[in-house]
Design a protein with these regions (language model features):
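Eukaryotic tandem repeat interaction scaffolds
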Residues: 305-320, 328
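Long internal repeat-built scaffold domains in very large eukaryotic proteins
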Residues: 1-9, 14, 20-26, 30-34, ...
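Extended, well-ordered protein cores
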Residues: 191, 204-205, 226-238, 242-251, ...
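Alpha-solenoid HEAT/ARM repeat scaffold
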Residues: 10, 44, 80, 240-243, ...
């Protein structure tokens, strides 16, 4: 053999199994292993010859022991042959576990390691060789599993009991096993179990799939099926891995067919009755829409994304916010590429229809969508902002082009206009805006948007709910209906004679006009929005601290004990005043009972909002007033309990 030419040596070795007697196998194997150690170029024919010889268990173990160390240093062209040989010759005993572990330790991400940047042609050739080697390694896994059923059982057991983080090779094995008949349920169970343990992670999935496009193209449907199974799991950790599968498949496989399949899988999840599935699918789409160039890729399949809207009626509020954030991101992506705002796109048309719909459900969806899009558009630093505009702005301000600002203002006006005469919807719109501005991603909203909303909220609040007090904080009489016998009184006046405003509660609650009575529905929501915008524009709520100590325009509690209670300062005064209020309330006619209950309910919610708005302030004066408001809240809740107790009796008796 040493005297023969290399090509002749390969041909002779390949012919060994045809003319060697079984009794000579030991000597032949020893010779072949020596040839393999002496000349790595002979490794392929040696492996081919060894796989066609009849070897006993001891001799086979010797061969495997010699071959396994060559896995880590094998050339790209030889590696698939080594993998296939080891899998086909592995049994079901302990040696098969060693064989499997040596294969699992392969760093599949290193198959495409190129040369230095200076040798570009060689690097591209190396990358092509790596891609081909990846495909051949996966083919060798499939061939080994199909030819040796015993090893598949060992593989499944080893993967299931793994306690450390899985490798990309493990993911390849799972995908190959998933493609073989009869193994799908077991592979699904292993993936869910290992994901729950935290050893099958999103990072492993990304490493296994992202760098192996050509190799895994045949197994795209297997990866998609695994993604769906993991996303449907009730545990958040498998869902996280399922999301990584979907995200990586969309980014890695650039063909339209593959991306449409990924989107169709996500759409299927959004139509599920499981809120967890919907959240997971929407979050994947949101992440893709928030990143370039993935947002541009997603826009090319916008029709598929819009199919999610078919399930919107079943979505929770947060899911609707996420959905419209996706569309807002895609609109911004289109604006960056075209330079203009799509004013008549389908999403804008849908929002107009929802906001104009008489059904509160659709109007609510429109408010959620419009608010999500406003905050998304307003929080983005757009490259179209001019240098001059940027120079005039504060460093922390987020500047957006005039066209986009006009679009946002128009959408806000559309929201407020659609809520005219519908206080419940208007209160919800205020709450949505306040919630959006309190979130961390809105700290860079264009200050012009915040200022416009603050000015509108401030004007509506002052004009709708505050009255001026006379000299020495005297309460001016307000018009009351004829049926009302209650006298008016200022409650909870912390500013005493310095008070200049009072919160108008009783006159609004007792008004003969339904529009004025319904104004109280939006009181707390509007104040919450006012606090949010004030804090973002000024850094604190000192500009509106006058409302913290101002009194409430309420009814006088006219009993013999009420005056004594109001004069006391000990903790017993609350109990005495509760007794006085109970006596006062019990003697009222039903209509006045309902009115007083409404006033106390409004006062309770108002005090709670004051605490929410001012509890973080550092000023000593405001902290003292806040503590007093906390005491007031306790007293109001006791009064509200008394009111509800009596009203419940009336409802039962009637």
């Amino acid at each position: 053999m040493p005297l023969l030419h290399a090509d002749m040596q390969r041909e002779v070795i390949e012919c060994f199994p045809e003319f060697i007697d079984d009794r000579q196998h030991d000597e032949v194997v020893e010779s072949l292993l020596e040839q393999m150690d002496g000349n790595s170029a002979l490794l392929p024919p040696v492996l081919d010859a060894l796989s066609n010889l009849h070897l006993d268990d001891a001799l086979l173990a010797t061969v495997q022991h010699k071959v396994m160390p060559k896995l880590q240093s094998a050339e790209l062209q030889v590696l698939p042959l080594l993998v296939k040989f080891l899998l086909q010759t592995a049994g079901s005993g302990a040696e098969s576990t060693s064989v499997l572990r040596s294969i699992r330790d392969l760093d599949v991400t290193a198959l495409r390691l190129g040369f230095d940047e200076g040798d570009r042609e060689t690097k591209r050739e190396r990358e092509r060789e790596g891609a081909s080697a990846e495909s051949l390694v996966i083919d060798s896994l499939r061939g080994g599993f199909r030819c040796n059923f015993a090893i598949t059982t060992v593989v499944l057991k080893e993967l299931e009991k793994t306690q450390t983080e899985h490798t990309p090779m493990d993911v390849w094995m799972l995908l190959v096993l998933h493609s073989l008949p009869g193994h799908r349920p077991k592979v699904h169970a292993i993936c869910r179990k290992q994901a729950k343990r935290g050893v099958l992670t999103a990072a492993v999935v990304r490493r296994a799939v992202a760098a192996s496009l050509s190799a895994l193209r045949e197994y795209f449907s297997e990866a998609l099926a695994l993604a769906g199974t993991l996303t449907r799991d009730s545990n958040p950790m498998p869902r996280r891995v399922g999301s990584a599968f979907y995200h990586t498949l969309f980014v890695t496989f650039e063909e339209d067919f593959h991306r449409q399949e990924v989107l169709q899988g996500l759409i299927t999840h959004t139509g599920s009755a499981s809120a967890r599935e919907v959240d997971c699918a929407l979050e994947v789409a949101r992440e893709l829409s928030a990143q370039e160039p993935h947002a541009a890729d997603l826009r090319r399949h916008l029709q598929f994304v819009q199919n999610i809207m078919d399930y919107m009626e079943a979505f929770a509020d947060e899911q609707i916010r996420t959905l419209y954030s996706i569309f807002a991101n895609l609109s911004l992506s289109a604006m960056r590429s075209t330079g203009s705002m799509p004013m008549d796109d389908q999403i804008h048309i849908l929002l107009r229809k929802q906001l104009g719909h008489p059904d509160a459900l659709y109007k609510r969806m429109g408010i959620l969508g419009a608010t999500a899009m406003v905050t998304c558009f307003g929080a983005v630093q757009h490259p179209a902002a001019t240098d001059a505009t940027a120079a005039d702005a504060e460093p922390s301000a987020c500047l957006i082009p005039a066209e986009l600002l006009k679009y946002i203002e128009g959408m806000l006006e559309m929201v407020f206009t659609s809520c005219v005469g519908k206080p419940g919807c208007l209160a919800f719109a205020y709450d949505e805006l306040a919630l959006a501005f309190e979130q961390s991603n809105c700290t860079k909203v264009d200050e012009r948007i915040l200022t416009n909303i603050f000015e509108r909220a401030s004007e509506d609040f002052e004009g709708g709910y505050l009255l001026d007090l006379g000299d020495d904080a005297a309460l001016s009489p307000a018009p009351m209906p004829d049926w009302l016998s209650l006298k008016s009184q200022a409650w909870m006046n912390l500013d005493q004679h310095n008070a200049v405003i009072i919160l108008n509660v009783l006159p609004l609650a007792a008004s003969a006009l339904s529009s004025e009575r319904e104004q109280l529905t939006t009181l707390c929501s509007l104040f919450r929005l006012l606090v949010s915008t004030t804090r973002l524009t000024s850094g604190s709520v000192e500009d509106i601290d006058a409302v913290l100590g101002c009194p409430l325009y309420m009814m006088a509690v006219t009993t013999s004990t009420a005056g004594a209670a109001s004069a006391m300062t000990s903790s017993d005064s609350i109990n005495i005043f509760d007794s006085a209020f109970r006596a006062f309330f019990s003697n009222l006619p039903r209509r006045e009972k309902e009115l007083v209950t409404k006033c106390v309910f409004v006062a309770t919610n108002w005090t709670r909002e004051l605490l929410n708005g001012f509890c973080m302030e550092k000023s000593t004066e405001m902290r003292v007033k806040t503590r007093q408001r906390l005491r007031d809240l306790v007293g109001l809740e006791r009064k509200l309990d008394i009111c509800l107790e009596f009203l419940l009796r009336l409802m039962v008796s009637s």
